[in-house]
Swiss-Prot record:
GO annotation, biological process: symbiont-mediated suppression of host cytoplasmic pattern recognition receptor signaling pathway via inhibition of IRF3 activity; symbiont-mediated suppression of host cytoplasmic pattern recognition receptor signaling pathway via inhibition of IRF7 activity
Matching HAMAP family: ROTA_NSP1
Family: Belongs to the rotavirus NSP1 family.
Source organism, top-level taxon: Viruses
InterPro entries attached to this UniProt entry: Rotavirus_NSP1 (IPR002148)
Lineage: Viruses, Riboviria, Orthornavirae, Duplornaviricota, Resentoviricetes
Entry function: Plays a role in the inhibition of host innate immunity by inducing the degradation of key host factors required to activate interferon production such as IRF3, IRF5 or IRF7. Associates with components of cullin RING ligases (CRLs) including CUL1 or CUL3, which are essential multisubunit ubiquitination complexes, to modulate their activities.
Cystine pairings recorded for this chain: none
Motif pLxIS motif boundaries: 485-488
Domain notes: The integrity of the zinc-binding domain in NSP1 is important for degradation of host IRF3. The pLxIS motif targets host IRF3 for degradation; however phosphorylation of NSP1 pLxIS motif is not required for its activity.
Subunit structure: Interacts (via C-terminus) with host IRF3; this interaction leads to IRF3 degradation. Interacts with host IRF7; this interaction leads to IRF7 degradation. Interacts with host CUL1 and CUL3.
Chain intervals for the UniProt region annotation (Interaction with host IRF3): 320-495
Name of the molecule in the record: Non-structural protein 1
UniProt region (RNA-binding), positions on chain: 1-81
Length: 495
């Protein structure tokens, strides 16, 4: 069966446009790079291989050969991978453009066949090449595509020669077939017309073609934060915020949509060549503040959390405790977003003040029934189980009933940050000494959402943005977040 790699290798000699479009990494020298231990189709050479992460989108979709070309389907340079990429929604006109792309880049006619016969080394006898010499001429046109689902309305489809579905559940895409959205008979006629130029004995490949063109579609996979690699994440030790490096091939030429790009492919090939010749490999540094990272960090925080702090007598913040084996968490918070650190300090301080105001406890080495609930409370932040967990924590503080309402005391001294936060949340001039469940819950929710408005957070990293969006955000100054650096009085915070 013909492979996409073979077709790119031989067809790159036909035209000046092909020399640039068909230059894929799989036909060059292999450079050693780490892989993600994920088996799947490389989207650039359409081969089954161990995938490694792409520097443009941080998703594993290229092999160790093709990754050295540094191409991503989200680039705006019109290379072959970009030309095979179509954004949702799929229309019949877009599918026709994909078919025209194959006919332009990989034509099959008498002139092309004769040229390839002259180009292939014959040595002693053509019989030695009875199978090999024409392999690249048997490339069928299929409408199979690798589908990336970022959300319900943000989907990308990368068309190529995929001979079967993806078996690895960790691959970020799924193979779908759009033959029903086009026209089965019309696509068959296009392929029969292409193959009619080949010798009769080669037309038996039609049976294999039908198997590929009728490949059933797989159920789309929703991409989550865990699918993105950590290799492109950069932690800014100065601002204490995570960021992500995004590399894209950027050209000054712009197209309104895919249809205009394919129109230039047919009518103005020199424009595409000029765009590829003048493109620049550009680095974008973007913030990594998204809901996926927030949930991952909250999960890690709950795992490393030291709930013994709520029974301790430490005067400092929970994140500053360093020499207490029951409360030390500084090793984890040293390289974490300062907003998470501030939230952890306020939350633990508030629960500590409430708990010690109502329950007779010793110090941080004592064993309390509330400890497991503290971890559960952190894990339940920004989830639907938050209200239930807050109520359980409240009930473990020995509330008393006053006029039919359960209340707890708040009589310990508060630090200035927590004092201002409670005043702002309850909208009062002085802190009450008695809290009911609604007030307690409001304070906990206010502390957790002090720095994060979940409704406005993106679900996935900025690396899923198109190159045009990244350029626009960079020019407007919204690509990175700007915060005032929190300066602590503790010398340990500056380490």
């Amino acid at each position: 069966m013909a492979t996409f790699k073979d077709a790119c290798f031989h067809y790159r000699r036909l035209t000046a446009l092909n020399r640039r479009l068909c230059n894929i990494g799989a036909n060059s020298i292999c450079m050693p790079v780490p892989d993600e231990k994920i088996k799947g189709w490389c989207l650039e050479c359409c081969q089954i291989a161990d995938l490694t992460h792409c520097y443009g989108c941080s998703l594993p979709h290229v092999c160790k050969w093709c990754v050295q070309n540094r191409r991503c389907f989200l680039d705006n340079e019109p290379h072959l991978l970009k030309l095979r990429t179509v954004k949702h929604p799929i229309t019949k006109d877009k599918l026709q453009c994909i078919i025209d792309l194959y006919n332009i880049i990989f034509p099959i006619n008498d002139k092309v066949i004769r040229k390839f016969e002259r180009m292939i080394k014959q040595r002693k006898c053509r019989n030695q090449y009875k199978i090999e010499w024409y392999n690249h001429l048997l490339l069928p046109i299929t409408l199979n595509a690798a589908a990336f689902k970022f959300d319900e309305n943000n989907l990308y489809y990368v068309f190529g020669l995929y001979e079967k579905s993806v078996s690895d559940i960790y691959a970020p895409y799924r193979i779908v077939n759009f033959i029903n959205e086009f026209d089965k008979l019309l696509l068959d006629d296009i392929n029969f017309t292409r193959m009619s130029n080949l010798p009769i004995e080669l037309r038996t490949i039609m049976q294999e073609y039908f198997q590929l063109s009728r490949l059933p579609s797989s159920k789309l996979k929703q991409i989550y934060f865990s699918d993105f690699t950590k290799e492109t994440v950069i932690f800014n030790t100065y601002t204490k915020t995570p960021g992500r490096s995004i590399y894209r091939n950027v050209t000054e030429f712009n197209w309104r949509d895919e249809l205009e790009l394919y129109s230039d492919l047919k009518n103005d090939k020199n424009k595409l060549i000029a765009a590829m010749m003048t493109s620049k490999y550009t680095r974008f540094y973007a913030h990594d503040n998204n809901f996926g990272r927030l949930k991952m960090t909250i999960f890690e925080l709950g795992h490393h959390c030291q709930p013994n702090y709520v029974a301790s007598n430490h005067p400092g913040n929970a994140s500053d405790i360093q020499y207490c084996k029951w409360c030390n968490i500084k090793y984890f918070l040293s390289k974490i977003d300062w907003r998470i650190r501030d939230m952890y300090n306020l939350l633990m301080e508030f629960i500590k003040d409430c708990y010690k105001s109502n329950v007779n406890v010793g110090h941080c080495s004592s064993v309390e029934n509330i400890y497991p609930l503290i971890k559960r409370l952190i894990w339940s932040l920004f989830t639907n189980h938050m209200d239930q967990t807050i109520e359980e924590v409240f009930n473990h503080m020995s509330p008393v009933s006053v006029e039919g309402t359960n209340v707890i005391m708040l009589i310990l001294g508060l630090n200035i940050s927590l004092y201002n936060e409670i005043k702002r949340t309850l909208n009062v001039d002085s802190i009450p000494m008695v809290l009911n469940l609604n007030e307690f819950s409001s304070i906990v929710k206010s502390i957790s959402s002090k720095w994060y408005n979940v409704d406005e957070l993106d679900k996935l990293p900025m690396s899923i943005k198109s190159t045009e969006e990244l350029i626009e955000m960079k020019n407007s100054g919204t690509l990175t977040e700007e915060f005032e650096l929190l300066i602590s009085n503790s010398e340990d915070d500056n380490e």
